[in-house]
From Swiss-Prot:
EC nos: 2.3.1.16
Name of the coding gene: fadI
Family: Belongs to the thiolase-like superfamily. Thiolase family.
Protein name per Swiss-Prot or TrEMBL: 3-ketoacyl-CoA thiolase
Pfam families xref list: Thiolase_C, Thiolase_N
Organism of origin: Citrobacter koseri (strain ATCC BAA-895 / CDC 4225-83 / SGSC4696)
Catalytic EC class: transferase
Keywords: Acyltransferase, Cytoplasm, Fatty acid metabolism, Lipid degradation, Lipid metabolism, Transferase
Xref: CDD domains: thiolase
GO molecular function: acetyl-CoA C-acyltransferase activity
Cellular location(s): Cytoplasm
GO terms classed as biological process: fatty acid beta-oxidation
Reactions that this protein is recorded to catalyse: an acyl-CoA + acetyl-CoA = a 3-oxoacyl-CoA + CoA
Active site, renumbered: 99 (acyl-thioester intermediate), 392 (proton acceptor), 422 (proton acceptor)
Length: 436
């Protein structure tokens, strides 16, 4: 069993999150159509620095992520530094942990702060499902390499003659797990069947997510954490997420057919996250550095945990695995939390994790723990809606959740909050946040 692990520097400074910002999230091929992730990243980091009024030289490191990477910009972090007017000497590197990428970016900056190598940094992520690295078939790729080595026109023509029409078809990015061939939706279907989660339960959670997200926007709760953007042809501002269905009814969800298991499935496009474009980032500092600069932190990073499980069956159980570890490291229990924000990749996945957090059997037989993590209080859970409503630009979701949770904690007078997510490859992430 792990013990509480205080996240502080050698001088006893807490890790402060002083501000956070994101672009509005856009459904694939809508408001951000044609804008690559690196440009979305530049948008949000540039605006974050402008709003914070922090001198560029104060930021000593930028860790950024992108899941669907573009070959022409393999280090999105460095491109953001070079494209936003930041100090050219700012250290910058990129990370990828699938849907938990910006969780990892935040953890990396926090570790640099604790090590004392920096006193302030930026973490975040961006993804575009509208600008994708469309590839070629393996056969064509191999022949193109061989053609480059061929010496004569005859040799080149002979190589090209081996190709068939099907070899010339473009190859979009894979939507399946590399190691298993399973799509994420296939795993969600597995989980629905394993844990007895009905179509009605999934649709109800999705409807709840959209209703709460719509209410959050209507009440102005997201205005300070979402920037206004202008995308080509620069005629209209884009300032609110365009996936939220505030006027939908439960009956609307019931009309959709299963998207993965066509005959017996329960996972639909409406109770899953859509493909989305967007970016998000946060500024982290040591507590003393924030005080020197006269900054009031949004909150503090209390603990974090990353876990991994097998990918063949029910692999999206990351929250059920990582949450108890993060709570233990924070010296807290689930009951101590004021808010719980869980990434909604699919309604089925979300409901399965909620079920297992309260399962004594899962805790004992799978996690090797004496007691269940705890029953999730609905009044604390995804109170502003979740990814099913907002959308899910893979690398940006974690930073969105962190910023959103800290703002809501402050509105409620402070306390502790949990942000947690599943990720491809059987990975899981959880962070405990604190606001005063």
């Amino acid at each position: 069993m792990s013990q509480a692990l205080p996240l502080v520097t050698r001088q006893g400074d807490r890790i402060a999150i002083v501000s956070g910002l994101r672009t509005p999230f856009a459904r694939q091929a809508t408001a951000f159509h044609g804008i690559p992730a690196v440009e979305l990243g530049k948008m949000v980091v540039g605006e974050l620095l402008a709003r914070s009024e922090i001198p560029a030289e104060v930021i000593e490191q930028l860790v950024f992520g992108q899941v669907v990477q573009m070959p022409e910009a393999p280090n999105i972090a460095r491109e953001i530094v070079l494209g936003t007017g930041m100090n050219v000497h700012t250290d910058a590197y990129s990370v990828s942990r699938a849907c938990a990428t910006s969780f990892q970016a935040v953890a990396n900056v926090a570790e640099s702060l604790m090590a004392g190598t920096i006193r302030a940094g930026i973490a975040g992520g961006a993804d575009s499902s509208s600008v994708l690295p469309i590839g070629v078939s393996k056969k064509l790729a191999r022949i193109l390499v061989d053609v480059n080595k061929a010496r004569t026109t005859g040799q080149k023509l002979k190589l090209f003659s081996r190709l068939r029409l099907r070899d010339l078809m473009p190859v979009p990015p894979a939507v399946a797990e590399y190691s298993t061939g399973l799509r994420m939706g296939d795993t969600a279907e597995q989980m629905a069947k394993t844990y007895g989660i009905t179509r009605e339960q999934q649709d109800a959670l999705a409807h709840r997510s959209h209703q709460r997200a719509a209410q959050a926007w209507a009440e102005g709760k997201l205005a300070d954490e979402v920037m206004t953007t202008y995308a080509p042809p620069y005629k209209e501002p884009f300032s609110e997420d365009n996936n939220i269905r505030g006027n939908s009814t439960l009956a609307d969800y019931a009309k959709l057919r299963p998207a993965f298991d066509r005959q017996h499935g329960t996972v639909t496009a409406a109770n899953s996250t859509p493909l989305t474009d967007g970016a998000a980032a946060v500024i982290l500092m040591t507590e003393s550095r924030a005080k020197e600069l006269g900054l009031a932190p949004l909150g503090y990073l209390r603990s974090y945990a990353f876990t991994a499980i097998d990918v063949w069956q029910d692999m999206l159980l990351g929250p059920a695995w990582s949450t108890p570890l993060a709570l233990e490291r924070a010296g807290l229990t689930l009951a101590d939390l004021s808010l719980i924000d869980m990434h909604e990749a699919f309604a089925a996945q979300t409901l399965a994790n909620i079920q297992l957090l309260g399962s004594e059997r899962f805790a004992r037989d799978v996690l090797g723990r004496a007691h269940a993590t705890g029953e999730v209080d609905d009044s604390k859970f995804n109170v502003l809606g979740g990814s099913i409503a907002y959308g899910h630009p893979f690398a940006a979701t974690g930073a969105r959740m962190i910023t959103q949770t800290l703002h809501e904690l402050r509105r409620r007078g402070g306390g502790f909050g949990l942000v947690t997510a599943c990720a491809a490859g059987g990975l899981g992430a959880a962070m405990v946040l604190e606001a005063e």
